[in-house]
Amino acid sequence: MISLSALVKPKDGIHSVRLLEKSLRDHYENVPVRDHQYLVRFADGPALVTDELAGLRVDVVVSDERAASHFREALASEIATRVLGRTVDVVWSRSATVPAPLR
C-alpha cells in the first residue's frame, strides 16, 4: 500500500483552491470527518480532503505504483476541469503513516 498526499496551493489567491474544494464536494459523494475535513468518494476509492489555511491537502491510499500514477493523473484532470484557468501548484509526497479516516 502507498500513502500519497497532494498539497494544492494557489498561485493567484486562495479563491482557486476554495473553488476546487466546493466543486469536489458538489460533484462527488462526500462525508464530513471533522471541521474542514471530509472523505470524497472518487471512482477509484476514497480520498481525505483537508482544508488548510494555505491550500487544500488530498490524501489517498493506493495499492501500487500504477494506481498511484492513475490517481495523480485523475487529480490533475479534476483540478484542470474544476479550477478553469486559474493556476495552482500541486506538490506530491509519500507518508509512512496512513491518515486515520483512510484506515
Name the predicted role of every residue range.
Residues 32-66:
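Short, intrinsically disordered low-complexity segments
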Residues 1-12, 16-24:
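Short glycine-/aliphatic-rich beta-strand segments at the starts of folded cytosolic domains
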Residues 1-3, 53-55, 85:
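A general secondary-structure signal for short beta-strands and their flanking turns/coil
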Residues 63-99:
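C-terminal structural segments of small proteins and small subunits
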Residues 19-37:
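Short, flexible N-terminal segments of the mature chain
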Residues 16-18, 50, 68-70, 100:
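Short acidic, gly/pro-rich beta-turn/loop elements at beta-sheet edges
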Residues 3-7, 41, 89-91:
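Ser/Thr- (and often Asn-) enriched beta-sheet segments in non-cytosolic proteins
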Residues 38-45, 94-103:
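Polar/charged, Gly/Pro-rich intrinsically disordered segments
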